[in-house]
């Protein structure tokens, strides 16, 4: 006896499953924001911006070491819990981390405000090209981000907003990825079914978790250098391949 909702054992379904239809063509793509389409400028540049360009490189290096150490600070760790569920929690999480370095504590708010300032962000070298080609091919595009502020001004500053038809900001909904609610909201805004939608990001848990909501997902390696090519051409290949595979054979 087959089932359409299998119970999975360690090696796979316990009972045979009903034949699955071929994967649907991808009609919509959802992107993560930071680390996927754009990246904040380097911490060294940001520190120079708040302390002054005359700050010695050795001093900046010392502060960067302090930020690295701050990630293990118990107070900083506590502040990250639920970071993206509200604007207030988001600011608190980041400013607590910045302030864990005594020399940066007076500048914690200024460093946080850089996050909300469009010119501090850099699109990856292939972001514009990828979004433009997807839009040209009729693919609906959305952005789903764990974040504490509105993203359209940043995209507009870089001329990218015209490609994006849906925005889902975690802080507006009191939850974080991979909550299916966020992916469902984005699919609804794009009038695309989850099985017709691809989620692209750089976090295996948060962005890869879109699979739990019925989407396909593509996860990029984290930690790309600001301004480099991100490898987003693979997204175009996935979309095109899905459409070729869905065409009836002659």
Please give the residue ranges for each predicted region.
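Asp-based, Mg2+/Mn2+-dependent phosphohydrolase catalytic module
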Residues: 1-31, 35, 104-106, 128, ...
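N-terminal helical cap/lid subdomain that shapes the substrate entry/recognition surface
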Residues: 7-125
């Amino acid at each position: 006896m087959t089932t359409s909702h299998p119970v999975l054992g360690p090696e796979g379904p316990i009972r045979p499953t009903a034949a699955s239809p071929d994967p649907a063509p991808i009609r919509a793509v959802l992107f993560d924001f930071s680390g996927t389409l754009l990246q904040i400028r380097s911490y060294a540049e940001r520190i120079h911006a708040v302390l002054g360009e005359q700050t010695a490189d050795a001093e900046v290096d010392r502060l960067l070491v302090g930020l690295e150490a701050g990630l293990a600070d118990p107070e900083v760790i506590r502040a990250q819990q639920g970071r993206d569920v509200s604007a207030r929690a988001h600011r608190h999480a980041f400013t607590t981390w910045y302030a864990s370095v005594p020399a940066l504590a007076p500048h914690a708010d200024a460093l946080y405000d850089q996050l909300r300032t469009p010119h501090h962000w850099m699109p990856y070298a292939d972001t514009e090209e990828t979004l433009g080609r997807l839009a040209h091919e009729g693919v609906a595009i959305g952005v789903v981000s764990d974040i504490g502020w509105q993203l359209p001004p940043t995209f507009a500053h870089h001329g990218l907003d015209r490609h994006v038809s849906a925005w889902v900001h975690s802080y507006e909904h009191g939850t974080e990825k991979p909550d299916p609610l966020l992916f469902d909201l984005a699919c609804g805004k794009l009038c695309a079914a989850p099985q017709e939608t691809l989620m692209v990001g750089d976090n295996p848990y948060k962005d890869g978790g879109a699979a739990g909501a019925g989407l396909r997902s593509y996860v990029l390696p984290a930690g790309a250098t600001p301004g480099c090519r991100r490898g987003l051409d693979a997204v175009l290949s996935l979309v095109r391949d899905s459409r070729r595979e869905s065409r009836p054979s002659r």
